[in-house]
Structures are given as C-alpha cells and as structure tokens.
C-alpha cells in the first residue's frame, strides 16, 4: 500500500525546493537593501546636509550672487549689491539673461538637482 517515490520524483522535488528557497532568499535580500536605502535617504543626517549644502538656485533670491571656483565672477551675472554664497564643491552654474531659463536645460549642473531625485 505504501509505494516510495521513484528517483525522478525525488530529484524534481529537490530542484523545486531549491528554486523556492532561492526565491525567498532573493526576496529577503531585496527587501533588506530597500529598507537600508530608504532609511539612508530619509535620515536627516548626511543626505539632507549634502542636499542643502550643494543646492543653490540663483533665481530664488535676486539679491544673491554665487561665487564659483574656476568660473566667471558673480558680478557678471548681477550688477547690483548682493549677498555672497560660496559654492566651491558644486559644479559650475550658468548665468542667463532671463532668470527662470538656463542656457542648457538638458544637462543641468549637479547643484541644481536634488540627490533624492529619481529614487
């Protein structure tokens, strides 16, 4: 009345259990990495400081000028008395005639993009 499994059935069960175990392992790995990345982006520490330090929009306050390392002077953009913000760690910002339009919209400098953008 009791008939043992043949060899093919045992091999099929072993392969199926291995695939199922690998799927659970990969799902756990993906969830672990997702939680670590989301915690890193939500933390008020380094990500927020780096975002605030490097994000400067020259068009938000017309009384600010931006002094860049190895770039044109800020007085070339604004001809009036202005507050000064030093941005040495950021890429070069572009001065335009109209404040809301940048010279090359397709490739904005990294200082005008949030580090959380696209995630």
Swiss-Prot record:
Protease listed as a keyword: no
Swiss-Prot/TrEMBL keywords: Secreted, Signal
Location(s), subcellular: Secreted
Main location, first listed in the record: secreted
A Pfam family it matches: FAM24
Disulfide bonds: none
Domain of life: Eukaryota
GO cellular component, one term: extracellular region
Secretion signal span: 1-40
Signal listed as a keyword: yes
PANTHER family (UniProt xref): PROTEIN FAM24A-LIKE, PROTEIN FAM24B
Record-stated family: Belongs to the FAM24 family.
UniProt protein name: Protein FAM24A-like
Organism listed in the record: Mus musculus (Mouse)
């Amino acid at each position: 009345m009791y008939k043992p499994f043949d060899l093919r059935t045992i091999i099929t069960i072993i392969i199926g259990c291995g695939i199922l175990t690998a799927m659970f392992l990969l799902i756990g790995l993906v969830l672990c990495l997702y939680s670590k990345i989301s915690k890193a982006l939500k933390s008020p520490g380094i990500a927020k400081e780096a975002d605030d330090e490097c994000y400067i929009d020259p068009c938000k306050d017309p009384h600010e000028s931006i002094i860049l390392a190895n770039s044109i002077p800020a007085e070339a953009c604004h001809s009036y008395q202005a507050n000064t913000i030093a941005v040495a760690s950021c890429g070069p910002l572009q001065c335009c005639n109209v404040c809301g339009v940048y010279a090359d919209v397709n490739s904005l400098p990294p200082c005008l993009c949030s580090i959380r953008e696209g995630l």
